[in-house]
C-alpha cells in the first residue's frame, strides 16, 4: 500500500516539497525538480514576471504534472499576504497557498500576529492554508484553531542551512496539533531532511539547500533519499536511547563456559 499523505482534498505520495528560487538557470532548476521526485513545487507569486512568455517564463520550466503551491513570500503585512494569495488564485494556481507574513527583513522570521490574522481571512475565503511559522507550539495550535490545513514550522531561518535547531519544539508541535506538520526552511543537507522525517514530520519543504548546492541535481537526489529514509525509519521505530551498552549476542551458553 502506498504511503500517501494529504492536505485538504489533495493527496500526495512524495514527502518532499521543493521551491523554484535561487537556481543558476531554468534548465538546472527543471532537472533538479525532476530528480527530487517531488509532486509539489512552490512559486512566489509576487516574483512572477507575467510579461515573460514561453521559455522566458519560470512556469514553462516546471515539469509537467507537478502541483503548484503559490506562496506569499516578500509580504510583510497580513493585507499584502491576503492580496497576494488572491492573485495566485486569479492566476488559476488553485486553492492551496503557502502563507508567509514576514516580520523581520534580516532573519525572515514570521510575524505571528499578522500570520494568524491573514490565515483566518483566507480560510473563510475557501483557501487551503499552509502557514510558514516559527517553532512555537502555542502558535501552531492557534493556526490550527484558525482553520489552517497544516502548519509549517521552520527548522532554522530561511536559506540559512543551519539544519533543525530546535528538534524538541518541533516534536512538541507534532504532539500538539492534529493537522499535518511540514518542516519548512533551514534544511542544509540530506541528514537534516532525514531527521525531520524521523521526528514525525509529514513532509519537508526546501529550496536553497538544493538550488545553491554545488550540484543541484545530485543534491535533489540526495534530499529525496534522505526524506524517504527518514520516513522509513520513523515508521520502523528507532530503538530507545540507553546510557549503558546492551550486548547484541546473549552472554549465556558461551563456548568454554
From Swiss-Prot:
Keywords: Cytoplasm, Schiff base, Thiamine biosynthesis, Transferase. It comes from the Bacteria. GO terms for biological process: thiamine diphosphate biosynthetic process. The active site is at 98 (schiff-base intermediate with dxp). Transmembrane segments: none annotated. Signal peptide: none annotated. GO terms for molecular function: thiazole synthase activity. Its EC number is 2.8.1.10. Disulfide bonds: none annotated. InterPro entries: Aldolase_TIM, Thiazole_synthase_ThiG, ThiG. Catalyzes the rearrangement of 1-deoxy-D-xylulose 5-phosphate (DXP) to produce the thiazole phosphate moiety of thiamine. Sulfur is provided by the thiocarboxylate moiety of the carrier protein ThiS. In vitro, sulfur can be provided by H(2)S. Homotetramer. Forms heterodimers with either ThiH or ThiS. This is Thiazole synthase.
Amino acid at each position: 500500500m502506498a504511503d500517501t499523505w494529504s492536505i485538504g482534498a489533495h493527496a500526495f505520495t512524495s514527502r518532499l516539497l521543493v521551491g523554484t528560487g535561487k537556481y543558476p538557470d531554468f534548465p538546472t532548476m527543471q532537472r533538479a525538480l525532476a530528480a527530487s521526485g517531488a509532486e509539489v513545487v512552490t512559486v512566489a507569486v509576487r516574483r512572477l514576471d507575467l510579461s515573460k512568455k514561453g521559455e522566458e517564463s519560470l512556469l514553462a520550466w516546471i515539469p509537467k504534472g507537478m502541483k503548484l503551491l503559490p506562496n506569499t513570500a516578500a509580504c510583510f503585512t497580513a493585507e499584502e499576504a491576503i492580496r497576494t494569495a488572491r492573485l495566485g488564485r486569479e492566476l488559476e494556481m488553485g486553492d492551496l497557498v503557502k502563507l508567509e507574513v514576514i516580520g523581520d527583513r534580516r532573519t525572515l522570521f514570521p510575524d505571528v500576529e499578522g500570520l494568524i490574522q491573514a490565515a483566518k481571512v483566507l480560510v473563510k475565503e475557501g483557501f487551503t492554508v499552509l502557514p510558514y511559522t516559527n517553532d512555537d507550539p502555542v502558535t501552531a495550535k492557534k493556526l490550527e484553531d484558525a482553520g489552517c490545513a497544516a502548519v509549517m514550522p521552520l527548522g532554522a531561518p530561511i536559506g540559512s542551512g543551519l539544519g533543525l535547531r530546535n528538534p524538541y519544539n518541533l516534536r512538541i508541535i507534532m504532539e500538539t496539533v492534529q493537522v499535518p506538520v511540514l518542516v519548512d526552511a533551514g534544511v542544509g543537507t540530506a541528514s537534516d531532511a532525514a531527521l525531520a522525517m524521523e521526528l514525525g514530520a509529514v513532509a519537508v519543504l526546501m529550496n536553497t539547500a538544493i538550488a545553491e548546492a554545488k550540484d543541484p541535481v545530485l543534491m535533489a537526489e540526495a534530499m529525496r533519499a534522505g526524506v524517504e529514509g527518514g520516513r522509513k525509519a520513523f515508521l520502523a521505530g528507532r530503538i530507545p536511547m540507553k546510557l549503558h551498552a546492551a550486548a547484541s549476542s546473549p552472554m549465556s551458553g558461551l563456548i568454554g563456559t
